[in-house]
């Protein structure tokens, strides 16, 4: 048997990303790992209900924005509180 484990985003500002995913979606860190040489940090965020995690990769020396190209990608969530989250996201801009 095989199951979906995680999805990854590379981020430039780890704390800003952590704050965003917490406020926007209620995702909290469930595991962290830092490279022995300090070159990168991984933070795995979970929803507290499923085993799926979002992995944020922070390359400590990276300063320029990532070129996301023209490929489409997305991360999907389900909720029975659509209006609540929609309002929160509108307020966040």
Question: Where are these predicted regions, by residue range?
Answer:
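Short, solvent-exposed coil/turn elements at secondary-structure transition points
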Residues: 33-35, 59-62
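Compositionally biased, intrinsically disordered low-complexity regions enriched in proline and serine
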Residues: 5-7, 22, 41, 59, ...
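Vicinal oxygen chelate
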Residues: 12-15, 64-93
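Short, charged/polar surface micro-motifs in flexible loops or helix N-caps
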Residues: 48-52, 61-63, 82-83
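Core segments of cupin and vicinal oxygen chelate
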Residues: 2, 8-51, 91
């Amino acid at each position: 048997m095989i199951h979906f484990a995680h999805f990854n985003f590379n981020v430039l500002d780890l704390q800003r990303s952590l704050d965003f995913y917490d406020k926007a979606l209620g995702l909290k860190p469930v595991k962290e790992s830092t490279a022995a040489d300090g070159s990168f940090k991984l933070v795995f965020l979970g929803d507290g209900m499923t085993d799926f995690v979002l992995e944020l990769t922070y390359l400590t020396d990276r300063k320029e924005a990532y070129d996301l190209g023209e490929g489409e990608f997305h991360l999907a969530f389900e909720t029975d509180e659509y209006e609540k989250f929609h309002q929160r996201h509108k307020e966040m801009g």
